[in-house]
């Protein structure tokens, strides 16, 4: 009876708890049903309002025509000066000014591969206009000012800055997005009403103020404009004074913006689980046509109007929009870049300056009361603040930044709930006090529920145990004695040292205790073994160090000291003679060594080749600051040899490839040469071989690093002339480095070719071998193309060792092993052309689509389809691209034969497509991409997820389609404004 009553009470308690939890969920759901929305302003001047819970678009508008928030003439001027790639454009002189678009107004000057922060913000330049500044020096980040009456010797370098600020106002209905009233930048209201806007707008209205800061750089002598730059920002305001909420907000969700292409940005909103109780989906996403600049949370019911932080995800190749040279080449391979760049139709801007990378969001949250109160003051009195002097601006700059802006912090996907690297969250959209009560109530209920279940199970177990071991109508004393008898039974695993607590535990407790004791004993044994092993290792290290320190040094009279351990000490270098890293021509040997405690590679060369060593040292000094060129540390010499201390590398590229071939490492470890028994291309028809080369990201990165290293040498007018697998090294961080520039030569400014013969044959082009003295930078392009093919296949494109030179002179090569990889096949094919003028330069190699991300390739195909759509079907362009239909369809001549039936049933439903037209195939890709969300689940499953799965579907069906389209646009429309972003 006792157990029955207890069980009934527990069941009743569980019933109450379950009802209570449902009430909590309903309460939270009711609280979440509000008008919370996200206000997003984009770089093209648009404003969007999304419902925070559902992700539905409430409205979008273009105030004042939707002019872009950023424009500059700097990059147009540079494109006129150079027709090279975008990387080369930014390198050319003079320097350029790059703004940040986070509202801080910070400006950075890019000059000679360096970024310097300008000591004046954009607002300060406008407020102090006119301003006379000297151009920044190459190695300095400071600028000096002068008045109009000053004159100096560097008068030609002085630039006059004229600035102005224009403000416009747009009053919007926050529910519908309808523009109620607006004021232009000239101060004119664009409605017929004469009332003050505060008197005519409803309570639910929002007022967007747009401030545009423009600076114009002029030549003070001639008055000619050098360039101009304009940056604007939208700031929303509410007409309700109580929107300055004093509640500290803690947004634990994630707002992430991913750059898909120049015209496509995906905004991803992930909401925290506790704010969406009972809802299966806690995230949503949208594609925007321009980069988001600011995001605000707005709710009229909760009186929220707060600027939110969001994380940006930029492709690694997007960071190469502007090269920033490293000042320390010994950095780890997984370092994070300080700056994140993006561009708007070729105009660079910074989305994440270093000042925002380490900010702590807790400061923003903890000081929210004061900051919120200061927000409207700063915004409403912006014009008054602009009239302050320069000193006041400098003193108040940090405070205003903190009050108006939440910092952009890099997103770490390894941390839960989108927390940033500082373990801090963004601003919350819920009342933290209410949320705290929800948590306490919910968590306490769960704890009670779990505790009740445990009590119920243990009570039932004890009750059954008593029934088995007692007769009916036994009294409490008998029950107690019986329980003691059961507990006094010993188990085989019971240990004696727990005897004193034996009577207070049942058999199950004893088993658990034994397992814990056995586990602890095993852990103690492992710890003892580790301590013992560690002591032995430390003892061996101490003995080795004592042996080195106490060794008797023998001086052989030539500046060389032989240590007792057999190592050779010469100058600052210690050479480990029994560790040979490699050998070279002319008696060259590379040893492992040490220099001032740093592990280095020591290259020993015969003194008679000192001329080559001096040339190599000179080139290494010039290329000292690049991660993909071997770094020079020191040079020592004795009577016989010259010793060069260079970056320590574990192996050469030749050793790497040979080890991969001999070991046949698994696909996860072997990045370049692998077998594939399943080509996974369906009816593709192009990859039918069982053994095919597979290229993963590691191999692609190695090839890119090779190109980057050569790009650095060529930027210094250095021609290597001896690029081969033996002269490409791999360091402990798996970075590729170009070495052995002993045969290189530094070209003079007016000298574009050189005449010098090398003993390394088989990797040089025909013009080098036949002695025509046309050895320009294209020599290195040819050699690098051969090295890339060797990295991928382990073979040489011009055949076996003894036939290579003959085949090179004939222009006879075979690269069919990578024919199933059209991108890299076309790149290598162009690099090893017989005629030097047909080979690309190193900038074109780096910008080749082989290195493009999937989303960029997909964007390119869509752009090509957009352009060809406006051409007549019989136009020369459409006729030319359609002539490649046999190549694209692998000889079938009709792309309909390769499309899956589920797509065929849908494609022909709306319009007719010609299976013999490449233009129509591109149209299919464009339409399916633009209407992907409208496709049926079967079609989405067939095509795969955007963008990777979608692109791979068509790439596997038509592996030649992309490269054919790329070469077609390259030939006919390369300089068209529609495609210039892809080629420069």
From Swiss-Prot:
Protein name from the UniProt record: Probable serine/threonine-protein kinase ireA
Biased composition, class Low complexity, residue ranges: 82-91, 141-150, 356-397, 472-489, 677-691
EC number: 2.7.11.1
Biased composition regions of type Polar residues, renumbered to the chain: 667-676
Enzyme class: transferase
Residue sites binding ATP per the record: 581-589, 603
Membrane topology: Single-pass type I membrane protein
Coiled coil (residue ranges): 467-533
Regions of this protein lying in the Cytoplasmic compartment: 458-984
Origin: domain of life: Eukaryota
One Gene Ontology term, aspect cellular component: endoplasmic reticulum membrane
Keyword Glycoprotein set for record: yes
Region entry Disordered, spans: 70-91, 137-157, 352-427, 472-518, 667-692
Topology feature Extracellular, residues: 27-436
A Pfam family it matches: Ribonuc_2-5A
Protein family per UniProt: Belongs to the protein kinase superfamily. Ser/Thr protein kinase family.
GO molecular function: ATP binding; protein serine kinase activity; protein serine/threonine kinase activity; RNA endonuclease activity; unfolded protein binding
């Amino acid at each position: 009876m006792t157990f029955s009553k207890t069980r009934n009470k527990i069941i009743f308690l569980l019933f109450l708890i379950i009802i209570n939890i449902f009430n909590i969920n309903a309460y939270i759901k009711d609280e979440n049903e509000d008008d919370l929305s996200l206000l997003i302003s984009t770089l093209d001047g648009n404003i969007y309002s999304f419902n925070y819970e559902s992700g539905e678009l409430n409205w979008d508008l273009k105030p004042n025509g939707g002019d872009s928030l950023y424009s500059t003439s700097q990059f147009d001027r540079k494109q006129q000066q150079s027709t090279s790639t975008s990387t080369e454009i930014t390198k050319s002189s003079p320097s350029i000014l790059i703004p940040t678009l986070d509202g801080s107004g910070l400006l950075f000057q890019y000059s000679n591969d360096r970024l310097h922060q300008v000591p004046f913000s954009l607002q300060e330049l406008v407020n102090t206009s006119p301003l006379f500044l000297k151009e920044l020096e190459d190695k300095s980040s400071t600028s000096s000012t002068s008045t109009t009456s000053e004159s100096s010797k560097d008068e030609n370098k002085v630039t006059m800055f004229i600035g102005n600020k224009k403000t416009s106002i747009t009053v919007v209905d926050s529910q519908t997005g309808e523009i109620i009233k607006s004021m232009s930048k000239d101060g004119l209201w664009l409605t017929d009403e004469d009332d003050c806007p505060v008197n005519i707008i409803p309570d639910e209205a929002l007022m967007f103020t747009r401030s545009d800061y423009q600076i114009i750089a002029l030549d003070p002598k001639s008055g000619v404009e050098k360039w101009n730059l304009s940056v604007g920002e939208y700031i929303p305001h509410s007409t309700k004074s109580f929107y300055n909420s004093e509640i500290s907000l803690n947004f634990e969700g994630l707002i992430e913006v991913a750059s898909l292409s120049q015209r496509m940005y995906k905004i991803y909103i992930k909401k925290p689980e506790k704010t969406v109780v009972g809802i299966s989906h806690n995230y949503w996403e949208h594609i925007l046509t321009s980069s988001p600049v600011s995001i605000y949370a707005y709710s009229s019911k909760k009186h929220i109007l707060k600027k939110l932080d969001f994380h940006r995800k930029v492709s690694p190749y997007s960071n190469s929009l502007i090269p920033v040279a490293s000042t320390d080449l010994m950095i780890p391979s997984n370092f994070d870049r300080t700056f994140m760049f993006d561009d708007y139709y070729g105009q660079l801007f910074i989305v994440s300056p270093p000042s925002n990378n380490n900010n702590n969001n807790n400061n923003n949250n903890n000081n929210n009361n004061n900051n919120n109160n200061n927000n409207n003051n700063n915004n409403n009195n912006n014009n008054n603040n602009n009239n302050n002097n320069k000193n006041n601006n400098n003193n108040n700059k940090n405070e205003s930044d903190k009050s108006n802006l939440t910092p952009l912090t890099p997103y770490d996907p390894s941390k839960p709930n989108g927390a940033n690297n500082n373990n801090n969250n963004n601003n919350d959209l819920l009342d933290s006090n209410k949320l705290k009560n929800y948590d306490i109530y919910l968590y306490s209920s769960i704890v009670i529920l779990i505790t009740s279940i445990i009590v119920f199970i243990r009570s039932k177990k004890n009750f059954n145990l008593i029934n088995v071991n007692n007769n009916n109508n036994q009294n409490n004393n008998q029950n107690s004695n019986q329980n003691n008898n059961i507990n006094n039974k010993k188990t085989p695993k019971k240990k004696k040292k727990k005897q004193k607590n034996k009577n207070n535990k049942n058999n199950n407790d004893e088993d658990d205790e034994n397992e814990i004791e056995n586990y602890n004993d095993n852990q103690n044994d492992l710890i003892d073994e580790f301590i013992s092993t560690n002591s032995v290792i430390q003892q061996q290290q101490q003995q080795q160090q004592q042996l080195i320190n106490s060794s008797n040094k023998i001086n052989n009279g030539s500046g060389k000291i032989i240590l007792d351990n057999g190592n050779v000490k010469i100058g600052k270098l210690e050479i480990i003679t029994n560790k040979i890293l490699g050998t070279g021509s002319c008696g060259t040997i590379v040893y492992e060594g040490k220099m001032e405690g740093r592990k280095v590679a020591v290259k020993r060369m015969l003194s008679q080749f000192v001329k080559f060593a001096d040339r190599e040292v000179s080139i290494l000094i010039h290329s000292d600051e690049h991660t993909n060129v071997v770094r020079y540390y020191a040079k020592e010499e004795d009577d016989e040899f010259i010793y060069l201390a260079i970056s320590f590398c574990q192996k050469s590229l030749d050793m790497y490839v040979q080890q991969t071939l001999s070991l046949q490492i698994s696909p996860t470890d072997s990045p370049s040469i692998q077998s594939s028994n399943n080509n996974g291309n369906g009816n593709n028809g192009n990859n039918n071989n069982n053994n095919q080369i597979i290229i993963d990201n590691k191999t692609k990165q190695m090839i890119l690093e090779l190109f980057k290293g050569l790009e650095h040498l060529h930027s210094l007018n250095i021609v290597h002339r001896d690029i081969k697998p033996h002269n490409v090294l791999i360091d402990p961080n798996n970075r590729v480095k170009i070495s052995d520039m002993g045969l290189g030569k530094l070209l003079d400014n007016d000298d574009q070719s050189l005449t010098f013969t090398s003993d390394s044959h088989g990797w040089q082009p025909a013009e080098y071998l036949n002695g025509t003295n046309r050895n320009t930078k294209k020599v290195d392009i040819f050699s690098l193309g051969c090295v890339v093919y060797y990295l991928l296949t382990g073979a040489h494109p011009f055949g076996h060792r003894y036939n290579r030179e003959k085949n090179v002179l004939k222009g006879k090569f075979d690269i069919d092993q990578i024919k199933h990889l059209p991108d890299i096949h076309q790149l290598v094919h162009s690099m090893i052309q017989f005629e030097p003028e047909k080979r690309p330069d190193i900038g074109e190699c780096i910008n080749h689509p082989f290195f493009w991300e999937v989303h960029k390739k997909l964007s390119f195909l869509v752009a090509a389809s957009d352009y060809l759509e406006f051409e007549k079907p019989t136009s020369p362009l459409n006729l030319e691209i359609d002539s490649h239909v046999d190549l694209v369809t692998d000889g079938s001549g009709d792309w309909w034969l390769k499309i899956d039936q589920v797509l065929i049933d849908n494609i022909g439903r709306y319009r007719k497509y010609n299976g013999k037209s490449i233009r129509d195939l591109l149209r299919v890709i464009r339409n399916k991409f633009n209407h992907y969300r409208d496709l049926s689940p079967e079609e989405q499953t067939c095509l795969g997820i955007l963008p990777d799965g979608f692109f791979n579907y068509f790439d596997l069906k038509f592996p030649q389609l992309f490269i054919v389209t790329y070469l077609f646009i390259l030939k006919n429309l390369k300089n068209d404004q529609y495609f210039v972003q892809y080629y420069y």
